Amino acid sequence: MSSVFEIVNQARRKNKLKRELLDNEKKVRDNRKRVDLLDNLLDYIKPEMTHDEILGIIKNMKADYEDRVDDHIIKSAEISKARRDISRRIRELTEEDKQTQGKK
C-alpha cells in the first residue's frame, strides 16, 4: 500500500515540476519579447526626433499590442468553448456507453 502512496506522491511531484517548468518557460519567453520590443523601439527612435514624435511611436506600438492582446483573448475564448463542447460530447458518449452496457 505504501508503494501506491509513493507512486501518487511522485506523480504529483512530477506534475508540479512540469507546471513550474512551463511557468518558467513562459517567463523566459515574455522577457525575450520585452527585449525585442525595446530593440524595436531603439530602431525607431532617432536623436533628432521630438518628444511628441517619440510619444507617437510609443502610442502606436501600445495600440498594436493592445489589439494583439484582444486577439489572444478571443482565441482563448474560442479554444475554451471547443474544450467545453468536447467535454460535453465525451460525457454524452460515456452515458450512452453506460446505458448500452447496462442493457446487455
From Swiss-Prot:
> Where in this chain does the entry annotate a coiled-coil region?
7-34, 76-96
Q: Which gene encodes it?
A: tmaR
NCBIfam families per record: PRK05423.1
Q: Which PANTHER family match?
A: UPF0265 PROTEIN YEEX
Q: Does the keyword Coiled coil apply?
A: yes
* Key word RNA-binding present: no
Q: Where in the cell is it found?
A: Cytoplasm
Q: What does this protein do?
A: Pole-localizer protein involved in the regulation of several cellular processes.
The protein in question is named Pole-localizer protein TmaR
Family the UniProt entry places it in: Belongs to the pole-localizer TmaR family.
One Pfam family cited in the UniProt record for this chain:
DUF496
Q: Which superkingdom heads the taxonomic lineage of this protein's source?
A: Bacteria
- This protein's species is Vibrio atlanticus (strain LGP32) (Vibrio splendidus (strain Mel32))
Q: Identify one Gene Ontology CC term for this UniProt entry.
A: cytosol
Where does it primarily localize? cytoplasm
Keywords for the protein's UniProt record, in alphabetical order = Coiled coil, Cytoplasm
